[in-house]
Amino acid sequence: IFTKIADIGSDLMKIVFKIKEDDARNPGVIADCTGDNAGDSVGPTADGFETYGVTGVALITFILLAVADPTVQVQLLVWIFVMRILMIGTSVASYFINEAYASSKYLKADKMNFEAPLTSLVWLTSILSVAVTYVVSYLMIPDLAGDTTLWWKLSSIITCGTLAGAIIPELVKIFTSTESSHVKEVVTASREGGASLNILAGLIAGNFSAFWLGLTITGLMGIAAAISTGFPATLMLAPAVFAFGLVAFGFLGMGPVTIAVDSYGP
């Protein structure tokens, strides 16, 4: 938090005194660089790693406590672990596919939009992850607990999380892309009004963006909860809680790609 405060203060002083990004006359440059690194790379990576582990442990614990049938427990646990491994695999495969596509398209191009290959990577990973989720679930749990519909219901819940991982970057891009009207408004406010107007313009854009992100997450979690109402009554306790965990599981399945895109920064 302290480095981010110094980072923001340093950036504002650059605007006020019209000095360059890494000008030694600005004593906040070191804190600025530290804050940028902490905010764009180290922070998201650490948070992602922690959440990645916590979500997996939470789902495993829930299955052991809420599912009464030992056979169903084992099937769900094996399915969860296989899904985790395959999601990492789809991220790696998507990277190489996207790299080949981007190289063929931009290798000899005079100009390049650096956001385009990142966006295509996110969507390619999400589409591949969804396809793999349904196929593998059908092969692994076609009649879980004697119910032949659970494989696609569980896959659909995970897909809600995967879609969140693809839709949220698009919403973020609306408020952070260099081509965004909101970003251009902040730039104009910074140029014409100085630090105070810059802060106000940024707060407005930030609060507006948070509304759409929250609405998206709420909607997808609502869909997951609705699907969970179709679970057999004897399958587990509190199926909606398990559904919310699977949404987070699907969202974090794109963790490697999300962190890579976040590290690029707007």
Question: What do these predicted regions represent?
Answer:
Residues 1-266:
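Hydrophobic packing and interface segments
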